[in-house]
Regions:
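A ubiquitous short alpha-helical element
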Residues: 1, 42-50
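Amphipathic protein-protein interaction modules
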Residues: 47-97
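Long, charge-rich, low-complexity intrinsically disordered regions
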Residues: 2-5, 10-15, 116-120
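Short, charge-rich, low-complexity alpha-helical interaction segments
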Residues: 18-40, 114
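Long, compositionally biased
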Residues: 94-122
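Intrinsically disordered, charged low-complexity linkers and terminal tails
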Residues: 6, 10, 31-32, 58-61, ...
């Protein structure tokens, strides 16, 4: 998908389940921005503590995945090429610490200080 065609939450979840390798981070953030209000919040990801306002992309994606009861691999696919090209292709690198920690600790390592997303009502 590209940003030229706006996706719905259901479009994104369908793409995620049918063609996870085609999901792009920018599209995920666009869907989140379109359908949710975001409130910066701190969160733990394994031993890493992210302060409110830091690593907001990871915060949004992880909270969206939690709201939609996604599996660990579905959640990782939401990070798009950051996961596929940067993390999977370079397993010993140290970039994308939140993605790498989620690979290692999964949902057991995630704890939000408060709700980060609230679905918009029309």
């Amino acid at each position: 998908m590209s940003l030229n065609k706006l996706m719905t939450i259901n479009d994104l979840l369908t793409q995620l389940r049918q063609a996870p390798q085609s999901v792009e981070f920018a599209d995920v953030i666009q869907v989140i921005s379109q359908f949710y209000t975001y409130k910066p919040t701190g969160f733990n990801n394994g031993p890493l503590h992210n302060l409110a306002g830091n690593n907001e992309g990871s915060c949004k994606v992880l909270y969206f995945a939690q709201l939609n009861a996604l599996t660990q691999i579905e959640t990782l696919s939401l990070f798009g090429s950051y996961y596929r090209d940067d993390v999977l292709a370079n397993p010993t690198a140290t970039d994308h610490e939140n993605i790498r920690n989620f690979v290692r600790y999964g949902w057991a390592g995630i704890k939000f200080d408060r709700a980060a997303l609230k679905i918009l009502t029309l």
